[in-house]
Amino acid sequence: MWSLGGLRLAAGHCLRLYERNASSSLRFTRNTDLKRINGFCTKPQESPKTPTQSYRHGVPLHKPTDFEKKILLWSGRFKKEEEIPETISFEMLDAAKNKLRVKVSYLMIALTVAGCIYMVIEGKKAAKRHESLTSLNLERKARLREEAAMKAKTD
């Protein structure tokens, strides 16, 4: 029986074979801007792109929102909100988010350990008072039997 992954591999293999063996005028292309003229593919005339201010060294920049600014502050990347530049790279924001995720996970681990320790202490106090689930259930059942007996006597 064919699995879904096997079908994908087979389809990809067949497509690569077809692309390799197809004639140049009929070759598949992932660039949709190509035009077919007289059996030849030509690229349309492209105007030279002017570098925008949002790209510096080939890295796209992003204007952070207020919440993202708080993330940058909480992660320790910047000390004050005034220090945060107008635009930041996505890599800087991802690094700050990852650092904050790690800090939050450490906080949750610490709270879980503290909660476990607190429950152990409370359980030992309840054991000293001879309080257990078994004794509480026996008391509740005895009280319910008494109420049922009182109700039976009044009827």
From Swiss-Prot:
<dbReference type="GO" id="GO:0051402">
    <property type="term" value="P:neuron apoptotic process"/>
</dbReference>
<comment type="subunit">
    <text>Interacts with HSP90AB1; HSP90AB1 is essential for FAM162A mitochondrial localization and pro-apoptotic activity. Interacts with VDAC2; the interaction is probably involved in inducing mitochondrial permeability transition.</text>
</comment>
<comment type="function">
    <text>Proposed to be involved in regulation of apoptosis; the exact mechanism may differ between cell types/tissues. May be involved in hypoxia-induced cell death of transformed cells implicating cytochrome C release and caspase activation (such as CASP9) and inducing mitochondrial permeability transition. May be involved in hypoxia-induced cell death of neuronal cells probably by promoting release of AIFM1 from mitochondria to cytoplasm and its translocation to the nucleus; however, the involvement of caspases has been reported conflictingly.</text>
</comment>
<feature type="region of interest" description="Required for proapoptotic activity">
    <location>
        <begin position="77"/>
        <end position="103"/>
    </location>
</feature>
<comment type="similarity">
    <text>Belongs to the UPF0389 family.</text>
</comment>
<keyword id="KW-0496">Mitochondrion</keyword>
<keyword id="KW-0053">Apoptosis</keyword>
<protein>
    <recommendedName>
        <fullName>Protein FAM162A</fullName>
    </recommendedName>
</protein>
<dbReference type="InterPro" id="IPR009432">
    <property type="entry name" value="DUF1075"/>
</dbReference>
<feature type="transmembrane region" description="Helical">
    <location>
        <begin position="104"/>
        <end position="121"/>
    </location>
</feature>
<dbReference type="GO" id="GO:0005739">
    <property type="term" value="C:mitochondrion"/>
</dbReference>
<dbReference type="GO" id="GO:0043065">
    <property type="term" value="P:positive regulation of apoptotic process"/>
</dbReference>
<dbReference type="GO" id="GO:0031966">
    <property type="term" value="C:mitochondrial membrane"/>
</dbReference>
<keyword id="KW-0812">Transmembrane</keyword>
<keyword id="KW-0472">Membrane</keyword>
<dbReference type="GO" id="GO:0090200">
    <property type="term" value="P:positive regulation of release of cytochrome c from mitochondria"/>
</dbReference>
<dbReference type="GO" id="GO:0071456">
    <property type="term" value="P:cellular response to hypoxia"/>
</dbReference>
<dbReference type="Pfam" id="PF06388">
    <property type="entry name" value="DUF1075"/>
</dbReference>
<keyword id="KW-1133">Transmembrane helix</keyword>
<dbReference type="GO" id="GO:0005829">
    <property type="term" value="C:cytosol"/>
</dbReference>
